[in-house]
Design a protein with these regions (language model features):
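GST-like fold's C-terminal all-alpha helical module
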Residues: 104-198
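GST-like domain detector, emphasizing the conserved glutathione-binding G-site
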Residues: 1-131, 135
Length: 207
């Protein structure tokens, strides 16, 4: 099986961070090559040969091929390094973790992304912004955080009682929301606050 050579990365973007945290949890050292996506480095003809969607992360393998999309990369890394397991050990657990990861992606991560894209100065001039829509999405984010707080009642982690990719997805989403859209966890959301403190304190969160 082809082995990783390096990860095309952006230090701030949340999806490369998902892969970095996943790899760090497994003790995998991935050499990083920084790609300045804001300067358009991921949208050159040369980079499109690595990833036709023109984004990061991209994992380069030693057979000369490239793998894009953060969850796809994580699945590949899990196949190479099964432990510690982050995607599920059996069919039932895999389905449960996938369910929660998709919820974090579609209900939280996506809404935070739409908030950032339509309200953050970093995207002014890059996309047509719709500030009212962005603020409406901010409301959706806060509603989802309230529900996440209820879902964490009685659980240490998003998909149950151990750290998985679902926690990684939620962490990077909330953190980028705080960094670029001033999204904060309300102090009264005690379960969510404790979860965020718990996962942020893991060494991998600094990857």
């Amino acid at each position: 099986m082809a082995r990783p050579v390096k990860l095309y990365n952006h230090a701030v973007a949340p999806n490369p961070r998902r892969v970095r945290i996943f790899a760090a949890e497994k003790g995998i050292e991935l050499p990083l090559e920084e790609v300045d996506i804001l300067a358009g480095q991921s949208r050159t003809p040369e980079f499109f040969l690595k990833n036709t969607s023109g984004g990061v992360p991209v994992l380069e393998l030693d057979d000369g091929s490239y793998l894009s999309e953060s969850v796809a990369i994580c699945r590949y890394l899990e196949g190479l390094h099964p432990e510690p397991n982050l995607l599920g050990r059996d069919l039932r657990e895999q389905a449960e973790i996938e369910r929660w990861n998709r919820r974090m992606e579609l209900e939280l991560f996506a809404a935070i992304g739409r908030t950032i894209q339509n309200t953050s100065p970093i995207f002014q001039g890059r996309f047509k912004q719709f500030p009212d829509y962005g603020e409406a999405q901010r409301t959706v984010v806060y509603q989802r955080l309230e529900r996440m707080d209820r879902e964490l009642n009685g659980h240490q982690f998003v998909a149950g009682d151990r750290f998985t990719i679902a926690d990684i997805t939620a962490l990077v989403a909330i953190d980028i929301g705080g960094r670029l859209a001033d999204i904060k966890i309300a102090p009264e959301l005690a379960y969510l606050t404790r979860w965020h403190e718990r996962v942020s304190s893991r060494p991998s969160a600094k990857a």
